[in-house]
């Protein structure tokens, strides 16, 4: 397979409108010349998306200590953070864009990587052994509910009401065959091969680094993101989840934040 073809290295620019053009073309871009505070991250969303914004909640810190995120078992600054989508704690109403603003980088490690989900579907469709998976991803509903969060039973590949294709990438705990599946073994095989192929691609694509005052803007419906292990425990980023008028199913109910703190199911 042509796994070296599925990576995206965002172009850099200091022009927010150029960022919007690049994101629409490539799925991602890097905006330079920024401040390094959480409000600077939110301002990026306002400058790039303008009146297309529906919501730009407070930024969440991304560092070794974390904040309100549920961390996958075994993940630390010493391990790779595998490719994933952000915000699926909100179910199918996950944010359509994400922003990651660098406050402090690690000199050693911490490189980011992006896998183009649209391109991955094309590459897998051409493979004799994996060609069955892309159609299955678009037709087989699975359980995509993060533990304790908003429920989601849907396909990994969806087309939104406005025609936008949306993909979701999660770990083996949060994406699993549905209890009512007619063929759970085949559904599990679909999920494993999808996940393993994306993880394998990470070793074949170029990586890049964010430096202080730079932010990447990523189409969260199209690209999956991750980062390598790093040495400096003081590495610090600000993450902003963004909902625009082009999001698939509108805003989640209630207060929003750029992490899962407000997505938990309310006790009955």
Regions found by a protein language model. Give the residues of each.
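N-terminal non-catalytic cap/leader segment that marks the start of a structured domain
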Residues: 1-66
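Active-site environment of non-heme Fe oxygenases that use a 2-His-1-carboxylate facial triad
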Residues: 2-13, 24, 61-268
């Amino acid at each position: 397979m042509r796994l070296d073809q599925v990576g995206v290295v965002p172009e850099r620019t200091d022009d927010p409108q150029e960022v919007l053009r690049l994101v629409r073309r490539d799925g991602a871009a890097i905006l330079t010349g920024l401040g390094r505070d959480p409000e600077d991250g939110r301002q990026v969303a306002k400058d790039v998306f303008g009146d297309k914004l529906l919501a730009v909640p407070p930024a969440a810190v991304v560092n070794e200590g974390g904040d309100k995120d549920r961390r996958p078992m075994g993940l630390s600054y010493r391990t790779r953070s595998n490719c994933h989508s952000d915000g699926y704690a909100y179910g199918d109403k996950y944010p359509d864009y994400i922003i990651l603003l660098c406050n402090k980088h690690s000199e050693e490690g911490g490189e980011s990587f992006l896998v183009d989900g649209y391109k991955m579907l094309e590459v897998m469709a051409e493979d004799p052994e994996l060609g069955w998976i892309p159609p299955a991803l678009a037709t087989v509903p699975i359980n995509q509910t993060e533990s304790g969060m908003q429920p989601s039973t849907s396909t990994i590949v969806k087309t939104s009401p406005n025609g936008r294709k949306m993909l979701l990438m999660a770990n083996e705990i949060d994406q699993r065959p549905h209890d009512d599946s007619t063929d759970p073994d085949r559904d599990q095989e679909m999920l494993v091969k999808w996940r393993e192929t994306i993880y394998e691609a990470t070793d074949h694509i170029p990586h890049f680094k964010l430096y202080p005052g730079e932010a990447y803007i990523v189409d969260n419906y199209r690209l999956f993101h991750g980062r390598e292990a790093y040495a400096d425990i003081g590495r610090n980023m600000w993450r902003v989840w963004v909902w625009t008028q082009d999001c698939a199913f509108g805003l989640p109910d209630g207060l929003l934040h750029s992490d899962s703190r407000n997505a938990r199911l309310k006790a009955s």
